[in-house]
Amino acid sequence: DYEKASEYFEKGLEYDLNPKLEYVQDMVETYGYSLLNQKRIQEMMFLENVYNEFAVSADYVFLMGLAYMNNGLFDKAIDEFNKAKLYKLCKIEGCNSYKADYNIGVIYECLGNKEKALENYKKCGRYDPALNGIKRIGYN
C-alpha cells in the first residue's frame, strides 16, 4: 500500500535526521519510489531539495533521474542517469549501469532520436525492456 507507506515516510522525514545514515538514505529513496508508484510525479521534485545531502549513492542519483524524466526535464534526467553510472556500487541492480542506459534510451526514443535510443539500448545487454525498445524503434 504505497499511500499508507508514503504517510509513514512523511512522518519519519519530519524528524531531524542524519543523511549519512544508511537507513535514512533508504527511507528517502523508498519514499521517492512510493511517490512514483502513486503517480505523484510532481511531488518527487522534493528530491532536489536534499540533493547535496543524499547524492552519495547511485541509487539516489538514479531516482533523481527518474524524477526529472517523469517531470519532462529530459536533459537533467540524462545528466543524472549518466552520473549514476559513475558510481561503482548500488543497492538496486542496474541503476549504475544498464537501467540508467535503458532510461536514457527511452528518453531519446520519446524525443524521436532513434539512433541515440538504439545506442543506449545496445549498452543494456540482454535486458528485456531494452531489447523490446530496439524492436519498437524498428531495429532487430
Residue ranges with predicted function:
Residues Y2-E3, R40-I41, F74, K114, ...:
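TPR-repeat structural position
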Residues A5, E43-M44, A77, A117:
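Single-residue signature of alpha-solenoid repeat helices
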Residues F9, L47-E48, F81, Y121:
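Hydrophobic/aromatic packing residues within the alpha-helices of TPR/SEL1-like helical repeat arrays
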Residues L13-D26, Y87-G94:
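Flexible helix-coil transition and linker loops at the boundaries of alpha-helical arrays
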Residues L13-E14, N52-E53, N82-K88, G125-R126:
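Amphipathic alpha-helical segments of tetratricopeptide repeats
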